[in-house]
């Protein structure tokens, strides 16, 4: 640990601590595992800020005492910790004391002038030589004075730099505190903006509900419900709500709406005031600038450099004059430099010193002094600014926190407003909900049609798979059956056949209302939705975006377009092909109905949410752009599909025209043949009449077949009448198309309609029997509407035969015609037998229909069971809903209790943190307990009561502890006084013991070494004790006033750290002296007496040096050092050390 400041702090394991109130900085040696509390204790030891008053900030983080430094990423070389004094942040705290810089002035630091010191050259006869030591003393004085000024200047400049550094630290501390406040304010202000956004949304919704309540009531009254849903108590949509209770609810809502609006206005004004204060606080920080001060301090370094150069010059001059003096003293003056020349050269140097160097250094010193005063003023201004600024930050933080605490209250109020407007929202939501329900009925009906159609498609595919398997088994038995006995094949199970696959869809949605998409606008007009203008402008866009799931290719409508009907999990990747008994147009219409109904329902549910949503202009533009793109895509797909349908219709019309043209040609040819036969054969009129009747019959049959085919194409059954059970017989489409015309083949591929059974049978007979008669071929042409090659050749042959009737006998022709008529009759009988077989198949289908009817009844029973299960599930859901409501009410009560307890704890925390001492803490607790006791409420919960009791008990205990603490302090003071007195007594006792011990040791020494305590003689051993006057006096029973000489005292004490309490030695000399009277003392104060005394002292020294053992006597003395009375006799004893001196000496 150290208390020095480093400008570039980059050492690992060190934490830079900066005190904000005065700018002082300290380094703390620590590691990542050091606790923050240890850092705070160090700060308390070096700065005097109490542990409870410290607030530590690093960047935007507050350091918690119970955490480690690693939790905040400390220590780090590029981060510092700022220490704020909470006591100085209070509004009633005293202002900072002025900055005091205690420095020694130049006049006090100057050495005394040594102008009158004697020098050997002062007695020289030559005035020039006599002047040299004077110049030396003056130059040396100039040098010392300059060095003093320079040192004082450097110290003051260092103080200027220190003050500048401290101001920079305070500036960074202000920035950190400002960023911390700015971050806190930004979070609270963002919460305020989000709250105001939600409030404005709610306010617009509630205002619209209140303003348009009458219009909503009239809408519901004018909207008649569906006749099937009407009862005696329900005729219109208004009957869905209780109209009598609504008027009172509207009044309550209007009053609450106005009150809440006023409260929000006050809350908004509070935030305006908070914003103004924060902006004012941030604006006053702009006056905090350190650049000019740093530049000024840096610029004043030139004065130090200037003084340094002057000091070099003064030092050089001092060395010069000293060398001259030394040369004159040693008589080494050269002939070229005489003393007079040296003196004449030193004169101008003295003038430069006196008039240039020293005044310039004094001017530099004055400039640095002014800079120091300026820095002190700036530092005082900075201290006052930081003090006031931090108090403002504390105040602004308090009002921001006060505003923050109001957010939960207003959020709860918004929830209560929503609950209060629930009835009005119910009135507004009846119309859209009713329209959405009707649209949902239409969507479900369309979905059911598509679902049943796909079931038929699945049954058809499975039947085709079964027929393929049956053919494979028959071919296998036909190939291998003749070689293996039948019973073996039967035992192997090879005679089994696949069973029929029944795709059964149980009836559902049988109770749906019988309405179509057009009935939705009829029974629930669009004005019931009450779309806002913004919704109305985007309605078409949203509708088109909802329909954008249509495929762009009209001929390949994938099953994935029915994802909202959940068909993708059945045939997710397959293509929607034709469904038996339906047409592609009906499939498309059903899907479009479902999409339209779904869009209507979605708009009805989206309207109340989207109507008052606050959208930015960019979001509105994005929504409009996306809707426009999807609308353009949908319109393009519609145009392409329309073109495709027109091409298909044109192609079908061309086919129909070609068929009609060929039929007319065939009729004309038959008529021509008949007329030619009538001209050449007038004998057999009856045969010709029979032939005419048969031709007419075939024409009628052909025309009826054509009409039947057209009816089959245009008049297919509706999708909801399609049978749900399909039992299809085997078909051979490849054989049915073999003898058809190319145009008809193409048409059959497009329309995918089954051929008539008579046409298939006729075609098969033509393939098996070879060539048929002319009338049979023409019958095949009329029934099939096709132009095969073999019938065309027959017609050509018939025409050629008609042309040759003139040359042949008419009887042969009639006979041939009769044979052909007989063959046709046989064919008719075969057709009758086949018709009987078809009737049997119809009876089989009837039996299967009865079986399916039974399955249908079972399905209805299953549906009834499912309805019962659904009813039970609804009851269980209602139970869960009630439980959830109960839990919600409990949560609301707990939340209110928690908010109340939080308020109580805030009051408790403010009371705890308010006072700075124990007494203030006890008073604040007593005040809080009294305030809580005065605010007793009957409806408060047990938690609040327990909290009040705890606070009261805590206040009592704290008061007791405070009083007990005062008593303990008083006792401690008394104990300290007693302890001090005891310590003094102990010291006295110790001194007494030491004295007694010394005497005891002296007694032992005297007994041991025979110390003389009577008349002292040379060669005897004497003991001297240190008296109170600081002299060593001999222990003597008979004659006192034996004192130890100064030489002996120096001999015994120079090598010791302190003077011993006693000295024992062998006497080598005794000098007797008498204290003179005052008159004699004044008479002897002459120079001769002084010289005589000096000579006597020298004689005594020589006597001591030669270890004289004689006793000398002097009758006079010049002084009275031992404080004896006049005329008193005393003896100065000189002693020598004994062999073992360590035994006889002991330090005090």
Curated annotation (Swiss-Prot):
SUPFAM superfamilies: Ubiquitin-like. Residues 699-710 have a biased composition (Basic and acidic residues). One of its GO terms (molecular function) is protein homodimerization activity. Disruption phenotype: Mutant plants are hypersensitive to nitrogen or carbon starvation and show early senescence. A motif (AIM (Atg8-family-interacting motif)) lies at residues 567-570, 1130-1133. Residues 699-727, 754-777, 784-803 are annotated as: Disordered. Accessory protein involved in autophagy. Acts as a scaffold protein of the ATG1-ATG13 complex for faithful delivery of autophagic vesicles to the vacuole. Involved in the stress-induced phosphorylation of ATG1A for turnover of ATG1-ATG13 complex and proper ATG1-ATG13 complex assembly or activity. Required for selective mitophagy. Required for senescence-induced breakdown of mitochondria-resident proteins and mitochondrial vesicles. Seems not essential for ATG8-mediated autophagy. This is Autophagy-related protein 11. It comes from Arabidopsis thaliana (Mouse-ear cress). The gene is ATG11.
């Amino acid at each position: 640990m150290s208390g020095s400041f480093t400008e570039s702090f980059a050492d690992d394991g060190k934490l830079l601590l900066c005190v904000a109130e005065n700018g002082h900085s300290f380094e703390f040696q620590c590691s990542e595992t050091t606790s923050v509390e240890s850092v705070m204790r160090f700060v308390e030891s070096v700065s005097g800020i109490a542990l409870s008053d410290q607030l530590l900030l690093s960047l935007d983080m507050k350091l918690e005492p119970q955490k480690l430094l690693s939790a905040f990423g400390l220590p780090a070389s590029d981060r510092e910790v700022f220490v704020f004094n909470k006591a100085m942040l209070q509004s009633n705290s005293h202002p900072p004391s002025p900055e005091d810089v205690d420095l020694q002035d130049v006049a006090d630091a100057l050495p005394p002038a040594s102008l009158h010191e004697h020098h050997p050259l002062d007695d020289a006869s030559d005035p020039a030589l006599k002047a040299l030591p004077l110049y030396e003393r003056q130059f040396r004085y100039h040098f010392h004075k300059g060095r003093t000024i320079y040192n004082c200047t450097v110290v003051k400049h260092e103080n200027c730099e220190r003050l500048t550094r401290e101001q920079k630290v305070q500036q960074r501390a202000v920035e950190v505190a400002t960023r911390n406040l700015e971050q806190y304010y930004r979070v609270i202000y963002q919460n305020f903006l989000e709250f105001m956004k939600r409030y404005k949304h709610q306010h617009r919704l509630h205002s619209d509900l209140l303003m348009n309540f009458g219009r909503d009531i009239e809408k519901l009254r004018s909207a008649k419900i569906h006749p099937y849903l009407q009862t005696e108590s329900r005729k219109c949509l208004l009957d869905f709500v209780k109209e009598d209770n609504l008027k009172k609810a509207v009044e309550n809502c209007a009053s609450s709406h106005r009150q809440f609006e006023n409260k929000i206005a006050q809350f908004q004004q509070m935030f305006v005031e908070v914003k103004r204060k924060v902006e004012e606080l941030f604006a006053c920080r702009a006056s905090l600038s350190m650049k000019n001060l740093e530049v000024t301090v840096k610029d004043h370094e030139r004065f130090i450099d200037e003084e340094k150069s002057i000091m070099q010059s003064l030092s050089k001059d001092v060395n010069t004059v000293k060398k001259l003096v030394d040369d004159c003293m040693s008589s080494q003056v050269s002939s070229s430099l005489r003393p007079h020349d040296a003196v004449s050269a030193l004169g101008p140097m003295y003038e430069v010193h006196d008039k240039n160097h020293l005044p310039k250094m004094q001017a530099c010193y004055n400039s640095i002094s002014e800079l120091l005063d300026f820095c002190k003023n700036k530092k005082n201004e900075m201290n006052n600014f930081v003090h006031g600024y931090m108090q403002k930050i504390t105040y602004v933080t308090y009002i921001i926190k006060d505003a923050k605490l109001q957010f939960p209250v207003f959020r709860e109020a918004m929830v209560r407003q929503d609950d209060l407007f629930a009835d009005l929202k119910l009135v507004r939501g009846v119309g859209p909900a009713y329209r959405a329900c009707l649209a949902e009925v239409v969507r479900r009906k369309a979905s059911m049609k598509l679902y049943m159609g796909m079931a038929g498609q699945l049954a058809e595919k499975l039947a085709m798979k079964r027929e393929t398997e049956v053919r494979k088994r028959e071919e296998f038995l036909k190939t291998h059956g003749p070689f293996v006995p039948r019973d073996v094949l039967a035992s192997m199970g090879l005679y089994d056949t696949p069973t029929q696959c029944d795709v059964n869809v149980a009836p559902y949605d049988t109770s749906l209302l019988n309405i179509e998409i057009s009935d939705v606008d009829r029974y629930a007009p669009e004005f019931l939705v009450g779309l806002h203008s913004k919704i109305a402008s985007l309605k078409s866009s949203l509708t088109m975006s909802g329909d954008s799931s249509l495929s762009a290719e009209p001929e390949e409508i994938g099953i994935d377009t029915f994802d909202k009907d959940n068909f993708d999990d059945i045939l997710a990747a397959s293509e929607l092909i034709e469904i038996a008994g339906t047409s592609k147009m009906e499939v498309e219409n059903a899907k479009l109905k479902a999409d339209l109904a779904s869009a209507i329902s979605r708009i009805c549910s989206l309207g109340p949410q989207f109507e008052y949503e606050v959208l930015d202009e960019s979001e509105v533009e994005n929504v409009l752009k996306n809707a426009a793109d999807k609308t353009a895509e949908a319109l393009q797909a519609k145009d392409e599909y329309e073109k495709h349908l027109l091409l298909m219709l044109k192609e079908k019309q061309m086919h129909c025209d070609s068929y009609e043209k060929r039929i007319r040609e065939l009729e004309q040819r038959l008529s021509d043949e008949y007329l030619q036969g009538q001209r050449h054969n007038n004998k057999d009129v009856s045969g010709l009449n029979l032939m005419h009747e048969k031709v007419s019959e075939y024409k009628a049959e052909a025309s009826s077949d054509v009409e039947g085919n057209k009816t089959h194409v245009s008049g297919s059954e509706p999708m909801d009448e399609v049978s749900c059970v399909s039992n299809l017989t085997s078909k051979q489409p490849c054989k049915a198309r073999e003898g058809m015309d190319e145009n008809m083949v193409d048409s059959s591929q497009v329309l995918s309609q089954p051929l008539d059974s008579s046409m298939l049978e006729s075609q098969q007979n033509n393939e098996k029997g070879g060539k048929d008669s002319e009338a049979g071929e023409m019958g095949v042409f009329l029934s099939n509407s096709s132009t095969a090659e073999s019938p065309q050749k027959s017609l050509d042959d018939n025409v050629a035969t008609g042309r040759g009737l003139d040359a042949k006998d008419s009887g042969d022709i009639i006979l041939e015609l009769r044979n052909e008529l007989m063959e046709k009759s046989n064919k008719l009988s075969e057709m009758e037998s086949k018709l009987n077989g078809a009737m049997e198949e119809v009876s089989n289908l009837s039996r299967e229909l009865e079986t399916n009817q039974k399955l249908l009844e079972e399905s209805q029973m299953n549906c009834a069971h499912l309805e019962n299960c659904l009813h039970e599930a609804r009851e269980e859901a209602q139970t869960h809903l009630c439980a959830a409501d109960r839990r919600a009410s409990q949560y609301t009560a707990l939340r209110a209790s928690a908010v109340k307890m939080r308020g109580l704890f805030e009051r408790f925390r403010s009371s705890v943190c308010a006072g700075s001492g124990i007494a203030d803490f006890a008073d604040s607790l007593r005040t809080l307990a009294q305030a809580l006791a005065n605010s007793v409420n009957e409806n408060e919960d047990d938690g609040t009561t327990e909290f009040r009791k705890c606070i009261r008990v805590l206040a009592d205990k704290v008061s007791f502890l405070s009083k007990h603490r005062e008593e303990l302090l008083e006792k401690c003071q008394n104990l300290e006084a007693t302890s001090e007195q005891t310590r003094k007594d102990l010291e006295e006792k110790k001194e007494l013991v030491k004295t007694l011990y010394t005497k005891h040791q002296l007694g032992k020494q005297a007994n041991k070494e025979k110390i003389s305590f009577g008349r002292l003689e040379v060669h005897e051993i004497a003991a001297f004790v240190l008296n109170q006057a600081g002299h060593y006096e001999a222990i003597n029973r008979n004659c006192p006033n034996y004192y130890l000489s100064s030489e002996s005292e120096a001999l015994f004490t120079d090598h010791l750290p302190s003077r011993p309490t006693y000295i024992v030695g062998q006497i080598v000399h005794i000098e007797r002296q008498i204290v003179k009277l005052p008159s004699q003392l004044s008479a002897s104060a002459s120079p001769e007496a002084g010289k005589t005394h000096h000579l006597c002292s020298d004689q005594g020294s020589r006597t001591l040096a030669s270890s004289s053992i004689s006793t000398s006597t002097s009758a006079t003395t010049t002084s009275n050092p031992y404080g004896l009375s006049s005329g008193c006799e005393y003896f100065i004893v000189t002693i020598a050390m004994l062999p073992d001196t360590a035994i006889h000496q002991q330090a005090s």
